[in-house]
Amino acid sequence: MNKQIFVLYFNIFLIFLGIGLVIPVLPVYLKDLGLTGSDLGLLVAAFALSQMIISPFGGTLADKLGKKLIICIGLILFSVSEFMFAVGHNFSVLMLSRVIGGMSAGMVMPGVTGLIADVSPSHQKAKNFGYMSAIINSGFILGPGIGGFMAEVSHRMPFYFAGALGILAFIMSVVLIHDPKKSTTSGFQKLEPQLLTKINWKVFITPAILTLVLAFGLSAFETLYSLYTSYKVNYSPKDISIAITGGGIFGALFQIYFFDKFMKYFSELTFIAWSLIYSVIVLVLLVIADGYWTIMVISFAVFIGFDMIRPAITNYFSNIAGDRQGFAGGLNSTFTSMGNFIGPLIAGALFDVHIEAPIYMAIGVSLAGVVIVLIEKQHRAKLKQQDL
């Protein structure tokens, strides 16, 4: 493997491992500081909004100033963010930490993505980006597991460790990464109005709404899961890490071994509808359950459902896009980011009203998603009849 690509993969792995490390300890951290579910929602939303705003500028700056420089700046910001969270004793410091963390993600991701494109031979780009996606998922899966066991020592230790990982990634990047003489450009391109008029916007309206609704519901549940289980069955950070890591592993296995097989027998819309119905049933069981192992097993099942929905939506967007793959990908990303921003805000406020309220909201949103899928299926059927 190319040395630079290995370092880029390692950087991405460390970043997402660092993000995952802190998830199991948040309930203990919030209780320690006397913060609420609404506060957690604001912290998560601040990260998402900051990343959403900075990402396009990060891509443009990477093209103008060099991707290595932007990656290194992003890694330093990541470490600063984690260390601030580790020493923070009031909400304003934690909020500033999350904003800086979002900025770091908005710089590292475009820089790494662009540099992988630069140093990859054309016939290996798809494979290398596939590896990047797998490495991101690995960081998310392993992070909570490691963080939960670190929290047995101190609930602030995962944040210090994540900050140290950022410094390690920064040093490796300075020493081992080099900007290529010829590079791709992934920043803003000149907007040509005539291109927008050629796009059949009606094709994308319902899928975009579906993406927003599902991102809203999924992010709402995932943001409050650790706090929810901590309050309901007194899960410790180690328990939360087992649930999230176990669910992530099972979800990844289902994606690898079963997703392609399902796609041979179901259309994306049909598969999404059944996955949503499955998720509703499992979420209802989560509300009813009150035992340690019952909730642990149900948690595994919940994350499997969510991990199957996401690639199906991405696949559907790609299939309807035709020669507008870039536009469809951007639309998918934009509406996903909007859902990831709005969902935690509302879920956090609802949690303070009743701990089950975010689960009820996720159930309602999933049912709304089923209705949207049925509407989209009818629309697609009419379009096919018109083409005949």
UniProtKB/Swiss-Prot annotation:
Location(s), subcellular: Cell membrane
Keywords noted in UniProt: Cell membrane, Membrane, Transmembrane, Transmembrane helix, Transport
Membrane-traversing stretches: 5-25, 42-62, 69-89, 99-119, 129-149, 157-177, 201-221, 239-259, 269-289, 293-313, 331-351, 355-375
GO molecular function: xenobiotic transmembrane transporter activity
A Pfam short name: MFS_1
InterPro entries: MFS, MFS_dom, MFS_Efflux_Transporters, MFS_trans_sf, Multidrug-R, Tet-R_TetA/multi-R_MdtG-like
SUPFAM superfamilies recorded: MFS general substrate transporter (SSF103473)
A GO cellular component annotation in the UniProt record: plasma membrane
NAD is among the record's keywords: no
Gene3D superfamilies to which the protein is assigned, alphabetical: MFS general substrate transporter like domains (1.20.1250.20)
Keyword Transport: yes
Bilayer topology: Multi-pass membrane protein
Role this protein plays: Involved in quinolone resistance. May constitute a membrane-associated active efflux pump of hydrophilic quinolones.
Family membership: Belongs to the major facilitator superfamily. TCR/Tet family.
This protein's name: Quinolone resistance protein NorA
Gene name, Swiss-Prot/TrEMBL: norA
